[in-house]
């Protein structure tokens, strides 16, 4: 049985799901569930499980809450860590300080001027991902969006299209892109800046793999300053400022956050 905490609890309460014969409990993306406020739900699910069971916990980061789950609900756990190798010497990291109303124009300019392989453009909300993808298409760029608002079938088709090179630009949120293994990504664009260094590192780690060169480009406006300051607290990151090039100021056809206001994370 695979499900979100809320759906699992719903079935338990309606007695349409029984844990009586459960042997293995898997907590996937534990850090993300905790960040989204699901710790109480996760604990209720764990307490409903048989005491005699195997528990596996997967987490990209080990926060205090994840440690809490491990210590309280796991017996003599064994830790296994794995990460993709990114050659820092082959990863160029730069940022442009640009007014927010010119951010999309700069992105279009860079995508058209840079010689790239596959490109990932990160946004912090579903609506921004849709906004960017739809307007990139309007200006002749082959882009497609992926985020938590899409069905699993649609996400799978989107990823197949991107991996096959049928679409060269994937506009995505952090949640939707988690766990994806994509080869030949040459450029990462942060259209919206990460909220912390952990998210930033996850993003840029998708390029400069297996000895290949890669570039991470962040577009920083006033709404990104707070997150960017937190990212720069990590001394291991070498993000250099870049001078703004000459570029045409274009007008997006679809407004940012259209269809219900700015928001819709994931």
Model-derived regions, located:
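Conserved helicase RecA-like core
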Residues: 1-254
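Intrinsically disordered, low-complexity RNA-associated tracts
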Residues: 250-266
